[in-house]
C-alpha cells in the first residue's frame, strides 16, 4: 500500500485499496437532485444524435432547442443536494481506511483537509504513546482526552466529506447545463445557416425570373 506521504511527494491525488472502493462513501459520486437535472439526465445522450439528425431534417434541431428551454429553464433548476442518511456519513471505519492509505481519488482541497487532520492525529498519537509508559494501567484503559480528540477529528473528517458532496453536486449541475447549452447553440447555429441558405436560394430564384 502506498502512503499519503509518498503520494504527496509524487503529487498524486490517489491513495489505494480497490477492494474497498464499493464500500467507501468517498468513492460515490453525488449529483444534483433538482427537477431540471433529474429530467435532463436521460435526455442528454440524445442531444448529439438529434444534432446529427438535424443535418438531414432540421426539425431535430428545433426539438433540441425546445428540450433545452423546457428542461433547463422551465423546470425548477435551483441546486438541490442529496438527502444524506446517517449511515451515509463516513465513520471511524472510513477514517481508518484513509489513514491506512486506502487509495481513492480526492479533490486537492479535500486532500488538504485530510493532511491537516492526519498531522493533528499523528501529533496526538505521539504524545499519547510517549506518556503511556509513565501512566497507571487504569488511565490506559480509558483516555477521555483521546476519545475527545478522535471525535473532533471525525467531525472535521465529516466536514471535509460534506465539502466533497457539495463540490460533486455543483459540478454535476454545471456540467449538465453546459452540455445542453453547447449542443443547443450548435443546433441554433445550424438553423441560422439553413435559414440563410433558404433566403439566398429564394433570392436567386427571384433574380433568375
UniProtKB/Swiss-Prot annotation:
Please list every transmembrane segment annotated in the UniProt record, as residue ranges: 50-70, 185-205
Q: Under what conditions is it induced?
A: Induced by alpha-pheromone. Repressed by the ALPHA2-MCM1 repressor.
**Sites bearing Phosphoserine, chain numbering:** 121, 123, 125
UniProt key word Protein transport: no
- Entry annotated with the keyword Acetylation: no
Name positions with the PTM Phosphothreonine: 153
According to its UniProt entry, the function of this protein is described as: Required for receptor inhibition of inappropriately expressed a-factor receptor (STE3) in MAT a cells. Inhibits signaling by relocalizing the G protein beta-gamma (STE4-STE18) subunit to intracellular membranes. May also be a mechanism for the down-regulation of the mating pheromone response after the zygotic fusion event, promoting the transition of the new diploid cell to vegetative growth.
What protein am I looking at?
A: Protein ASG7
Q: Which organism is it from?
A: Saccharomyces cerevisiae (strain YJM789) (Baker's yeast)
Tell me the classification of the organism that encodes this protein. Answer: Eukaryota, Fungi, Dikarya, Ascomycota, Saccharomycotina
Amino acid at each position: 500500500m502506498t502512503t499519503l506521504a509518498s503520494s504527496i511527494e509524487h503529487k498524486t491525488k490517489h491513495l489505494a485499496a480497490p477492494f474497498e472502493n464499493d464500500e467507501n462513501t468517498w468513492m460515490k459520486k453525488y449529483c444534483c437532485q433538482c427537477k431540471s437535472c433529474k429530467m435532463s439526465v436521460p435526455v442528454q445522450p440524445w442531444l448529439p444524435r438529434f444534432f446529427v439528425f438535424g443535418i438531414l431534417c432540421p426539425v431535430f434541431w428545433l426539438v433540441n432547442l425546445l428540450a433545452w428551454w423546457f428542461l433547463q429553464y422551465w423546470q425548477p433548476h435551483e441546486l438541490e443536494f442529496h438527502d444524506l442518511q446517517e449511515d451515509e456519513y463516513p465513520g471511524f471505519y472510513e477514517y481508518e481506511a484513509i489513514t491506512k492509505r486506502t487509495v481513492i481519488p480526492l479533490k486537492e482541497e479535500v486532500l488538504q483537509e485530510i493532511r491537516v487532520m492526519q498531522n493533528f492525529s499523528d501529533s496526538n498519537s505521539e504524545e499519547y504513546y510517549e506518556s503511556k509508559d509513565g501512566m497507571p494501567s487504569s488511565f490506559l484503559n480509558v483516555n477521555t482526552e483521546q476519545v475527545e480528540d478522535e471525535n473532533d477529528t471525525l467531525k472535521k473528517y465529516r466536514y471535509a466529506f460534506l465539502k466533497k458532496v457539495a463540490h460533486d453536486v455543483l459540478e454535476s449541475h454545471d456540467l449538465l447545463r453546459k452540455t445542453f447549452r453547447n449542443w443547443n447553440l450548435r443546433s441554433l447555429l445550424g438553423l441560422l445557416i439553413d435559414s440563410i441558405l433558404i433566403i439566398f436560394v429564394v433570392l436567386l430564384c427571384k433574380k433568375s425570373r
